[in-house]
Swiss-Prot record:
Predominantly spinal cord and kidney. It comes from Rattus norvegicus (Rat). The keyword Transcription regulation applies. It is found in: Nucleus. The keyword Transcription applies. Residues 11-70 bind DNA. Gene3D superfamilies: Homeodomain-like. SMART domains: HOX (SM00389). One of its GO terms (molecular function) is DNA-binding transcription activator activity, RNA polymerase II-specific. Keywords: Developmental protein, DNA-binding, Homeobox, Nucleus, Transcription, Transcription regulation. This is Homeobox protein Hox-C4.
Length: 76
């Protein structure tokens, strides 16, 4: 059971070394295109050793952050 839980819910140590590089690559891709095709999402997921779902959710969250930053009026 412990092995199953560890594989389903990995701790923060998993992939920490690549985390900054992964975010950098995702940000570069987002700068180029805010929406991904499924084919591109698969390519990115494979190259960054992440799941398609992780890529999809990262882009959804990043679009919401972008929208929040660009839609809000500048405070005076």
């Amino acid at each position: 059971l412990v092995v199953m839980l560890e594989s389903r819910f990995p701790g923060p140590a998993r992939g920490v070394a690549n985390c900054r590089q992964q975010v950098l690559e995702l940000e570069k891709e987002f700068h180029y295109n805010r929406y991904l095709t499924r084919r591109r999402r698969i390519e990115i997921a494979h190259s960054l050793c992440l799941s398609e779902r992780q890529i999809k959710i990262w882009f959804q969250n990043r679009r919401m952050k972008w929208k929040k930053d660009h839609d809000s009026p500048t405070p005076k």
